[in-house]
Amino acid sequence: MRGIALFVAAVSLIVEGTAESSICSDFGNEFCRNAECEVVPGAEDDFVCKCPRDNMYFNAAEKQCEYKDTCKTRECSYGRCVESNPSKASCVCEASDDLTLQCKIKNDYATDCRNRGGTAKLRTDGFIGATCDCGEWGAMNMTTRNCVPTTCLRPDLTCKDLCEKNLLQRDSRCCQGWNTANCSAAPPADSYCSPGSPKGPDGQCINACKTKEAGFVCKHGCRSTGKAYECTCPSGSTVAEDGITCKSISHTVSCTAEQKQTCRPTEDCRVHKGTVLCECPWNQHLVGDTCISDCVDKKCHEEFMDCGVYMNRQSCYCPWKSRKPGPNVNINECLLNEYYYTVSFTPNISFDSDHCKWYEDRVLEAIRTSIGKEVFKVEILNCTQDIKARLIAEKPLSKHVLRKLQACEHPIGEWCMMYPKLLIKKNSATEIEEENLCDSLLKDQEAAYKGQNKCVKVDNLFWFQCADGYTTTYEMTRGRLRRSVCKAGVSCNENEQSECADKGQIFVYENGKANCQCPPDTKPGEIGCIERTTCNPKEIQECQDKKLECVYKNHKAECECPDDHECYREPAKDSCSEEDNGKCQSSGQRCVIENGKAVCKEKSEATTAATTTTKAKDKDPDPGKSSAAAVSATGLLLLLAATSVTAASL
């Protein structure tokens, strides 16, 4: 029995040891490199990387242990950071008359400033050092090097103002006879001097501008006015209503009620240099007789781009390009190849919603240090209480790092230090979750399809599938984005779509019959669909009819002149032939002439297209390039899907 008990105990230890080390053996040991992987007690799926010394932390981005107290982790509110050795940093200031090496104001300087009527403070103008501050109601006399009161030099104030602010005792040269016990009881007007005209040596009230004392208040000079004086301002600005501060000169004024009548109801009216201007707000444009913020051009969303109205013009922009790390952005296509995640936690400080971006670099450094350099950008979505951050990674994050922020590796009381500089509350971090972009960044694109497409996350793709009542004609793919181009008709259900997808094909409903077909510019292979590399017989015949040679390049068939041959060039058309009309009508479209060629357009667009100028052509993207890129990406995904099916069957 004793032997059996020992055997059972041994097996239990082996099983327990295997369970505890599984996360480390499967992933953690390689992740931690020169640090030691340890399973978090009570959480067998979580691990931490322990460095050989307590004064070190593991930097997952650099794959190495680093010292905790360095200039990388220390913030200097004043002075500069200096590392006395690899494991010790401190904030220091250069030796000076006013500061110590530890950036403290010297006692001698503080005493001297106090004797001159001021308070010694650290400079906040970008320079390192101390300054003798005379306060809001004083100024430094650079001749005597003493603080002088400015309350009686302020023409923008009254004696009642000084009384209510309890400032009467600061300067006896004005407001004689006023009593702070009753600021509403003013003495006779001719018995005291008003602020701006203090009492002089002869007992008379003197304009401070004439005695040059106004220089303590006015930075750019002064001039005498009916209100004692007012400050002058530099070119491009004018004195404000208080007579002291300066404000920029505006050449634009508001419109009168009569002038507003010349504008449309939705336009803003302003007068610039005497001319009445009627304009839409900067984020709207004029469509018909109304200013609207919505885009009316569909080409943006057809290429997976967002459309926005800026400075009264609508334009396409790619929401992914501004988020990418380097110059490897294809300027001709809007691709989504990155992976988006979200995480929330409680920091030791809070910001208002206008300053969330201030925290992004700090959070990015902490995230990369914790889980690795795959994350290249952080966007703070909310920071008013808890921080909600969007993490953008070059590739999918390992499932083993998604709970990494929840393991408090470096506790400090009720807080956890996420090196190098992020302090968060214990147990406040959520698990890192992949973001479903259909519910966030792709909402605008989904809305732009006007109910024809619905955004669905399918495996690795965000797919704008045809909605009920629409059927797929073909598909476009840009990285992780896919869109089914739809037309009114019977749509396939999820089972039919899944059945076709398993074959690497798309569902097509034509002539009352449903079937699976290879996407355009792919062809059936031994398994699934493969990317085309040659012209098909129909394309070859069309080129031969033109005495040209069919060449398949850039994912499309083109008719080219053979080498050393002089070829016939098809003349420009000025009207659609019966064959052209029939071809377009078969797909529910209408034939129009663009740049001498017959093209098929949706009937709703045909009227506009028929009158389109050459300038409109320049604004459209090259359809060859976009479709070629789409087929290339689609072909690659389908080939991978087919390969996966084969592997699974084997």
Swiss-Prot record:
UniProt xrefs under SMART domains: EGF
Q: Which residues form the propeptide?
A: 628-650
Residues with lipidation of kind GPI-anchor amidated serine: 627
Query: Which cysteine-cysteine pairs are annotated as disulfide bonds in the entry?
Result: 24-37, 32-49, 51-65, 71-81, 76-91, 93-103, 209-222, 218-231, 233-246, 255-269, 263-278, 280-291, 295-307, 300-316, 318-334, 486-500, 492-516, 518-529, 535-550, 543-559, 561-567
List every stretch annotated Disordered. Answer: 603-628
Q: What is this protein called?
A: Glycoprotein antigen BM86
Source organism (scientific name): Rhipicephalus microplus (Cattle tick)
* Membrane topology of the entry: Lipid-anchor; GPI-anchor
Superkingdom: Eukaryota
